[in-house]
């Protein structure tokens, strides 16, 4: 009887591991997000166009690899029948992470596109918020292997991402007021406003990832 129980537990462990095939995908997406956001922050530390182009290519490489990873996940989902999360939940999390990566890439492209004459502190702050959110996402993903046991840690990182998004909103609104009051050239106003909008949109995208994860963990705690 004991031997049978051990055999059943071993079988269940294999099924669970097989059912968690999506976790390495989430982890890799989080790695791309962290590298891309760190590279975006590095763009704030230089005014050299060649350096911007080089760093933008690094972000783009992460975005391309992220797209390929998402395609691979979709293929795996079509073949898998047993997972600890529902397919729709896995897709929602993965697609929102990919959307965040797209927004980071768009933010990096905006520097190359608009070639700003300066980088205001608020712009650099927005990039730092994105990087901090990416770090929180990486930590959050590492806990998804056992949602019930790690509920508090996951919820904490979700809350951290939300707080960073709120801080980014405040910074964005302050910056828009700043440029309209201090920038006399209408073209420059549009330029800096668009750059700030891209960055703020990325912080919103990070919150959407967090919101999708919140929905999943709440289902598991019902």
Located regions from the model:
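N-terminal amphipathic/basic-hydrophobic helices that include classical n-h-c signal peptides
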Residues: 1-7
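Cytosolic, long alpha-helical scaffolding segments
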Residues: 7-222
């Amino acid at each position: 009887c004991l031997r049978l129980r051990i055999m059943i537990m071993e079988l269940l462990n294999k099924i669970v591991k097989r059912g968690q095939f999506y976790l390495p995908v989430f982890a890799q997406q989080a790695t791309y997000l962290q590298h891309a956001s760190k590279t975006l922050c590095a763009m704030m530390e230089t005014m050299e166009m060649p350096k911007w182009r080089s760093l933008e290519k690094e972000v783009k490489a992460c975005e391309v690899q992220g797209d390929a990873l998402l395609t691979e996940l979709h293929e795996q989902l079509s073949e898998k029948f047993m997972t600890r999360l529902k397919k729709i939940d896995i897709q929602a999390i993965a697609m929102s992470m990919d959307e965040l990566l797209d927004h980071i890439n768009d933010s990096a492209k905006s520097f190359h596109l608009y070639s700003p004459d300066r980088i205001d502190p608020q712009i650099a702050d927005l990039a730092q918020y994105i990087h901090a959110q990416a770090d929180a996402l990486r930590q959050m993903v590492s806990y998804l292997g056992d949602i019930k046991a790690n509920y508090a840690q996951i919820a904490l990182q979700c809350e951290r991402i939300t707080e960073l998004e709120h801080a980014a909103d405040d910074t964005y609104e302050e910056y828009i007021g700043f440029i309209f009051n201090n920038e006399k050239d209408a073209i420059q106003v549009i330029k800096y406003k668009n750059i700030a909008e891209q960055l703020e949109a990325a912080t919103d995208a990070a919150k959407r990832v967090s919101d999708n994860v919140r929905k999943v963990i709440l289902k598991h705690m019902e």
